């Protein structure tokens, strides 16, 4: 989970100076994601820094239904019923409870993570390319407030055929490269509301921390 937190929670500000072709592709992608009543997603992530010798990988999955979501990253889990959000951290056996709308711009809701480009960036259409034998659009994102964030570029790979997000790469100022790859996406996936119910009894020995 820490990899994705590092990759996504540092995004902020408002967009300007957009590339028309890139913007049209991203607008279509946002509309597709927001048009889903529910969806299921699986992904992999990697953080690499040659200077420090860092090379860490994690996998995750998430279910989204309206404003509710359940997401797991490595050994950690986030559950939100749209009102409250619980982050279960197994390393220190703690559960952190917050209001679902608190720090909304830093939400780990998969739907919001998959539309994070909607604000905070200039964008530029780079080229068409191939990714795993599939034609993709390559779009660069550049933060408006570059001096306030730890990265300088995010590269998006969007399927030319389906207009789905396939991969995102973040390049940090210290040489760290973070990669997020979508491995499965199921539209309007069947998911019961019980998936988004948190029960402290299922986590004996854990400490509940309320903000």
Predicted feature residues:
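Positively charged n-region of N-terminal signal peptides that target proteins for export
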Residues: 1-4, 18
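Short, exposed beta-strand/loop patches in secreted or surface proteins that constitute
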Residues: 32, 60-63, 77-78, 123-130
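Sec-dependent N-terminal signal peptides
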Residues: 3-12
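N-terminal leader/targeting segments and the immediate start of mature chains
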Residues: 11-54, 67, 202-211
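An acidic-aromatic
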Residues: 59-108, 178-179
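A short, amphipathic edge element
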Residues: 23-24, 114-126
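Gly/Pro-enriched, hydrophobic low-complexity segments
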Residues: 125-128, 132-207
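Short, solvent-exposed helix-to-loop capping segments enriched in aromatics
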Residues: 33, 105-120
């Amino acid at each position: 989970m820490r990899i994705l937190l590092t990759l996504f929670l540092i995004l902020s500000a408002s967009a300007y100076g957009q590339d028309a072709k890139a913007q049209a592709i991203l607008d279509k992608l946002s509309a597709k994601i927001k048009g889903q009543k529910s969806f299921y997603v699986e992904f992999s992530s990697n953080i690499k820094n040659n200077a420090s010798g860092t090379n860490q990988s994690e996998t995750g999955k998430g279910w989204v239904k309206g404003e509710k979501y359940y997401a797991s990253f490595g050994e950690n889990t986030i559950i939100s019923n749209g009102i409250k959000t619980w982050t279960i951290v197994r390393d220190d056996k703690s559960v952190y409870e917050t209001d679902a709308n608190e720090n909304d711009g830093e939400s780990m809701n998969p739907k919001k993570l998959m539309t994070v480009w909607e604000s905070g960036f200039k964008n530029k259409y780079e080229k068409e390319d191939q990714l795993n034998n599939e034609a993709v659009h390559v779009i660069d994102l550049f933060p408006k407030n570059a001096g306030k964030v730890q990265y300088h570029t995010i590269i998006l790979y969007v399927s030319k055929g389906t207009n789905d997000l396939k991969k995102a790469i973040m390049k940090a100022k210290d040489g760290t490269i973070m990669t997020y790859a979508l491995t499965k996406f199921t539209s309007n996936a069947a998911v019961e509301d019980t998936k988004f119910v948190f029960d402290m009894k299922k986590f004996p020995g854990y400490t509940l921390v309320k903000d």
